[in-house]
Curated annotation (Swiss-Prot):
Its cofactor is Mg(2+). The lineage of its organism: Eukaryota, Viridiplantae, Streptophyta, Embryophyta, Tracheophyta. It is an enzyme of class 6 (ligase). This is 4-coumarate--CoA ligase 3. GO terms for biological process: phenylpropanoid metabolic process. Plants silencing 4CL3 exhibit significant lignin reduction, reduced plant height, decreased panicle fertility and abnormal anther development. Expressed in root exodermis and epidermis cells, stem vascular cells, leaf developing vascular bundle cells and parenchyma cells, lemma, palea, stamens and pistil. Its EC number is 6.2.1.12, 6.2.1.34. Residues 331-398 are annotated as: SBD2. The gene is 4CL3. It comes from Oryza sativa subsp. japonica (Rice). Disulfide bonds: none annotated.
């Protein structure tokens, strides 16, 4: 459909026509709308245990989970924390909370206790649903706040087993839920700063899923005959939205993996004839480079969705040699955007030819524009600028943070992504840089400000700055520039260990460079571009070596 000019603003739209989206219903009503057709079909399969649940059983489990959570005091407007790896109980709990008009805040079970406590406190969690590997991380918070803890994989002192939650009678009727009520509360660092609660409503998630899988020619063609691999963590919005919710809406079968293991992945693909494989580039790298994986192993896969981080042409070519029967394409998203901004049109029921390196075209029923990051002026085709998106799929705002919301969504409803890219003559979007400070380690967000705030609590660190450094396997890794206090001889290894005790594995500092000062502008903001330029020039290694040999100073 190309671009249209309105008040000198160049607006880009999908090549696919807009569709009618009924986002006046609740998310669970939307996901189970085809129950009469798919009720007896397999819905969720636990890849680890082999246990299978039909659509009717999943819907019933969500009603029982709702009743059980209500008995624990959860009601409309409350928040349930899901601190889980992928498992069927994640879906039961999420959908159950939705029926009560409650929201689920998703968190990584490998977070440190400090990270878990901070999110649970900020979100106002009323109940925490977790598992054995994380239960000890929540005990102190739960005891202090009187928050019940539910465990999905066994009995633990002071905790409620999830099977007890499911023992409740089915909820007779859902709560009176408004489309603009919050249903998901993932945490994101946005374009800068510490993690913030992203308020995604029933309306926004329905709109986002519909933009992908609804319509006569859906952008993302899932069918009830497809078997989707759910390997990417459901606590990440990409997997929750484009795998679980999109799969439920389409009536597909979803095979759940708790963690990535290449051998187990191949076994599940063969056993269940997996047809849809949502991956991130680090998984693609491992498959491409593994001599153990053959084209025969992965022959059933017809579609590989890659999101969360860019992927180059050389990697694509090596990977496709292993999955010759599949279409490979990329999407582009941001938690605050609902999360999908763009999707590869090669995934459509009636596919389009796409270019390598593109992250797709803007989703239907949405508008996208490119603006000059300095002036805000709207830019045309093939001109790089900040990507902005508008539509009913974007977040309601940040929880309890109107200032951050105002800085992200402008008065005209445009969400500013902080990503730099352009739209070419064929409406395909290319990402070229990032305005925002967030580091992407294997698709996971690493906010520099969080690490900097932690680093300067060390008595031997006077100042610190964290930036990204390119890495072949991870995409990016966090590295720290450190100014020591006068007389300090703190080492790189000591700093790494100090950070590692407080943060999840992917936020750990990869390398430390000692320096005399951190470059800042007159207002005190760290000049990260200057530090990245030093990395690109190879200067930090010399600085680090000199610092190791020289007397320590401030």
């Amino acid at each position: 459909m190309g671009s249209v000019a309105a008040e000198e603003v160049v607006v880009f739209r999908s090549k696919l026509p807009d569709i009618e989206i009924d986002n006046s219903m609740t998310l669970q009503e939307y996901c189970f709308a085809r129950m009469a057709e798919v009720g007896a079909r397999p819905c969720l399969i636990d890849g680890q245990t082999g246990e299978s649940y039909t659509y009717a059983e999943v819907e019933s489990a969500s009603r029982r989970a709702a009743a059980g959570l209500r008995r624990m005091g959860v009601g409309k407007g409350d928040v349930v924390m899901s601190l889980l790896r992928n498992c069927p109980e994640f879906a039961f709990s999420f959908l159950g909370a939705a029926r009560l008009g409650a929201a689920t805040t998703t968190a990584n079970p490998f977070y440190t206790p400090h990270e878990v406590h901070r999110q649970a406190e900020a979100a106002g969690a009323r109940v925490i649903v977790t598992e054995a590997c994380a239960v000890e991380k929540v005990r102190e918070f739960a005891a202090e706040r009187g928050v019940p803890v539910v465990t999905v994989d066994g009995a633990f002192d002071g905790c409620v087993e999830f099977r007890e939650v499911l023992a409740a009678e089915e909820l007779d009727a859902d709560a009176d839920v408004h489309p603009d009520d919050v249903v998901a509360l993932p945490y994101s660092s946005g374009t800068t700063g510490l993690p913030k609660g992203v308020m995604l409503t029933h309306r926004s998630l329905i709109t986002s899923v519909a933009q992908q899988v609804d319509g006569e020619n859906p952008n993302l063609y899932f069918s009830k005959d497809d078997v989707i691999l759910c390997l990417l963590p459901l606590f990440h919005i990409y997997s929750l939205n484009s795998v679980l919710l999109a799969g439920l809406r389409a009536g597909s079968t979803i095979v759940i993996m708790r963690k990535f293991d290449l051998g187990a992945l191949v076994d599940l693909v063969r056993k269940h004839n997996i047809t849809i494989a949502p991956f991130v580039p680090p998984i693609v790298v491992e498959i491409a480079k593994s001599p153990r994986v053959t084209a025969e192993d992965l022959a059933s896969i017809r579609m590989v969705m890659s999101g969360a981080a860019p992927m180059g042409k050389d990697l694509q070519d090596a990977f496709m040699a292993k999955i010759p029967n599949a279409v490979l394409g990329q999407g582009y998203g941001m938690t605050e955007a609902g999360p999908v901004l763009a999707m590869c049109l090669a995934f459509a029921k009636e596919p389009f030819k796409v270019k390598s390196g593109s992250c797709g075209t803007v989703v239907r029923n949405a508008e996208l524009k490119i603006v000059d990051p300095d002036t805000g002026t709207s830019l045309g085709r093939n001109q790089s600028g900040e990507i902005c998106i508008r539509g009913e799929q974007i977040m309601k705002g940040y929880l309890n943070d109107p200032e951050a919301t105002k800085n992200t969504i402008d008065e005209d409803g445009w969400l500013h992504t902080g990503d730099i890219g352009f739209v070419d003559d064929d409406d395909e979007i290319f990402i070229v840089d990032r305005l925002k400070e967030i580091i992407k380690y294997k698709g996971f967000q690493v906010p520099p400000a969080e690490l900097e705030a932690l680093l300067i609590t060390h008595p031997e660190i006077k100042d610190a700055a964290v930036v990204s450094m390119k890495d072949d396997l991870a995409g990016e890794v966090p590295v720290a520039f450190i100014v020591r206090t006068e007389g300090s001889e703190i080492t790189e290894d000591e700093i790494k260990k100090f950070v590692a005790k407080e943060v999840v594995f992917y936020k750990r500092i990869n390398k430390v460079f000692f320096t005399d000062s951190i470059p800042k502008n007159p207002s005190g903001k760290i000049l990260r571009k200057d530090l990245r330029a030093r990395l690109a020039a190879g200067i930090p290694d010399a600085v680090a070596a000199a610092a190791a040999d020289a007397p320590k100073s401030s």
